[in-house]
């Protein structure tokens, strides 16, 4: 889907930061996150586990424990800053204007309520539907997400369903409020390849039918490349590269993005061993000064020990790593 750059953003995230309270004091988990989301646009958030993708997504709706977290920056939805809204107004937006499909539905769905009751709860809250009217609409939603024999299965409990069916129920709950933005946090986790493809096809169809914007969180670059218009690559709590999905895949600017792409297996390559990125993401309390990727980077320079702001470039792209010459080698 091609999105006009002149379209006013639906969501604007500026200087977002998230800190968590620990026994040793406050620890920063995410910082310097900036992005926009246009109507009907899909943005992919990608990176290794621990890069800050889910922390970023949960913060958009202030879903972190308020006693042990603190948020900085702003998240504006249609001009309203979600970080300063009264709780009553925020509840109106959650699920209705902005909805979320969480990871691992077996731990998200209530095991003692039927799936019908859980869908009807959102219909009552956001549309005022009750009784038979709510049940009828819940069955329609199950049909829409392709649950077979929805009129019978609406009275089943989550444990009676497969992983793929539970994820479809989560999607039905999410779209019950007719949201303008859907946040899908690793929607295909723990599903086999065939079911993954079915879930992504379902999300694609719903996105187009309901004219939703989507924030897709995934470590699967191939999946994001087929679904998203733009991508934001995150590493150690910061975005390191953003841009149109085709540009990021064809001409990555940041060494971390290059490393992720090179680790994707190619059926045409005859390799005994896949390329890997040495090392691992540092813990939040042990992040290096300057470029956080420098200790793992094969192109690290002496200047990388200094803080690296993200630089806006042409074509809607941005990178935290300055353009380098082909002959440059690591000097650290």
Swiss-Prot record:
Q: Name one Pfam family in it.
A: oligo_HPY
Q: Biological process GO annotation list?
A: peptide transport; protein transport
Where on this chain does ATP bind? 47-54
Give an example GO cellular component term for this record. Answer: plasma membrane
Location within or outside the cell:
Cell inner membrane
Start and end of every ABC transporter domain?
A: 11-261
UniProt-listed CDD domains: ABC_NikE_OppD_transporters (cd03257)
Q: Name one GO molecular function term.
A: ATP hydrolysis activity
Q: Does the keyword Cell inner membrane apply?
A: yes
Q: What does this protein do?
A: Probably part of an ABC transporter complex that could be involved in peptide import. Probably responsible for energy coupling to the transport system.
Question: Which family does the record assign?
Answer: Belongs to the ABC transporter superfamily.
Output this protein's name: Putative peptide import ATP-binding protein BAB2_1052
